[in-house]
Curated annotation (Swiss-Prot):
Monomer. Keywords: Blood coagulation cascade inhibiting toxin, Disulfide bond, Glycoprotein, Hemostasis impairing toxin, Hydrolase, Protease, Secreted, Serine protease, Signal, Toxin, Zymogen. It is an enzyme of class 3 (hydrolase). This is Protein C activator. Glycans are attached at N45, N102, N153. Residues 19-24 form a propeptide.
Length: 255
């Protein structure tokens, strides 16, 4: 009952937030309820982000999603019809790389969160493994989130929307954004029409079944031609992530 009341309040805040932001999943369709068991909804001080459960105790999201009063929801699909196995967790520990921001791009935009209590696999909750190889240009990738499905005016879905996009040549994003970090991926549709943006920050980019990216930044308005999304490249951080999880909290980030 408490979780239901919390989610009702979250919906109200979600509506308010969407009126301020046009940068979310555009050009997609409703996700299948069984395709996003790893997807987390991260809520902190009026801001919404996505996240990815990578084992029973850890979630990956974007560094710039870090705000006070963070709550992490798992097992969610329709925000108006609560799944029986939906859970709420809080951060027990947070880990970052040194984060530098210029006027356009976040560098090392990654945050590893240890949950206050582990979760169990269930009908709507299961982790997504870290990648074994980096993606190649042209790879088909899946993105998802609960954000607005129209831009610039907001239209909110009750369920997360998913879209297929592609890994693009790094030069496309270099031309679109100043100061692009080397540990990022460029992904979208070159001619526009499908994309993720700010409101889905921290959500996953899944290419050929592997968790390859964390949404960092995108164009505004979103889904514009030659303005694809920029994603933190998860493969480059796998050693750091695994070291932190194993207890080496002084592990070095990639350069």
């Amino acid at each position: 009952m408490v979780l239901i009341r919390v989610l009702a309040n979250l919906l109200i805040l979600h509506l308010s937030y969407a009126q301020k932001s046009s940068e979310l999943v555009i050009g997609g369709d409703e996700c299948n309820i069984n395709e996003h068991r790893f997807l987390a909804l991260v809520y902190a001080n009026g801001s919404l982000c996505g996240g990815t459960l990578i084992n029973q105790e850890w979630v990956l999201t974007a560094r710039h999603c870090d705000r006070g009063n963070m709550r992490i929801y798992l097992g969610m699909h329709n925000l108006k019809v609560l799944n029986k196995d939906a859970l709420r967790r809080f951060p027990k520990e947070k880990y970052f790389c040194l984060n530098i921001r210029n006027d356009t791009i976040w560098d090392k935009d990654i945050m590893l969160i240890r949950l206050n209590r582990p979760v169990r696999n269930s009908a709507h909750i299961a982790p997504l493994s870290l990648p074994s190889n980096p993606p190649s240009v042209g790879s088909v990738c899946r993105v998802m989130g609960w954000g607005t499905i129209t831009s610039p005016n907001a239209t909110l879905p009750d369920v997360p929307h998913c879209a297929n996009i592609n890994i693009l040549d790094y030069a496309v994003c270099q031309a679109a954004y100043r100061g692009l970090a080397a540990t990022t991926l460029c992904s979208g549709i070159l001619e526009g029409g499908k994309d993720t943006c700010k409101g889905d920050s921290g959500g996953p980019l899944i290419c050929n079944g592997q968790f390859q990216g964390i949404l960092s930044v995108g164009g505004n308005p979103c889904a514009q031609p030659r303005k694809p999304g920029v994603y933190t490249k998860v493969f480059d951080y796998t050693d750091w992530i695994q070291s932190i999880i194993s207890g080496n909290t002084d592990a070095a980030c990639p350069p």
